[in-house]
Amino acid sequence: HEGMGPEHSSARIERFLQMAAEDNIQILNCTTPASYFHALRRQIHRNFRKPLIIFTPKSTLRHPNNTSSIDEFTGKSSFHRIIDEDIKKTTRVIFCSGKIFYELDDYRRENKIKNVKIVRIEQLYPFPFDTLGQVVFNHKDCEMIWVQEEPKNMGPWGFVKSRIRHLFTKYKLDQKIHYVGRKRAAAPATGIAKRHNTNQTLIKQISLQAPLKRVIKERVGVSFMKF
């Protein structure tokens, strides 16, 4: 989601996820060079052939933190369906997929936020129930939020929400997954830089700093018209 013109902004990830069933395709949203490398290598060496769809926004390629060490390419390194963080005293867990991670991480560093963990879902389909389930179970007392840039009726939200809720049921957790992102819209992007940037900042502020009451209040999504 690049926030430019309506048809220049989104790869329509929600449409690919709509087609995903019965392990028919693989849908990835890689956030590191090593993740991209291992995804391609895994595809070559697998003993079966199924379509691999990878989303790679241009702005992610230019981000200074989008790097991987040599060790992440060599030895026993491999593709990780999710990328977790080792953060102590976590009170809030943010789940996201794709380039929004870097904006959230930059905002977290700038504001010295120490209690929020960001978990990246690198493989959206087949959904990583096992690895993500372990994260959910280990943080059962934390606030849990899904963050995306896309409007609420687009992006991965419609696909992931029922699957994350399934994990709550599986582990018998009295939990809810809360949404932070843009409100439902007919077009993927406003096409007006000022509105886009203001909404982008609101998404970061609400997801990382706002109390849970405000997160719940904004559950319909951030409006394109707030600027």
Which residues does each predicted region cover?
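Thiamine diphosphate
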Residues: 2-12, 46-49, 61-227
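Generic detector of short, locally flexible boundary/turn motifs and exposed helical patches
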Residues: 17-21, 55-58, 109-113
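Conserved thiamine diphosphate
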Residues: 1-46
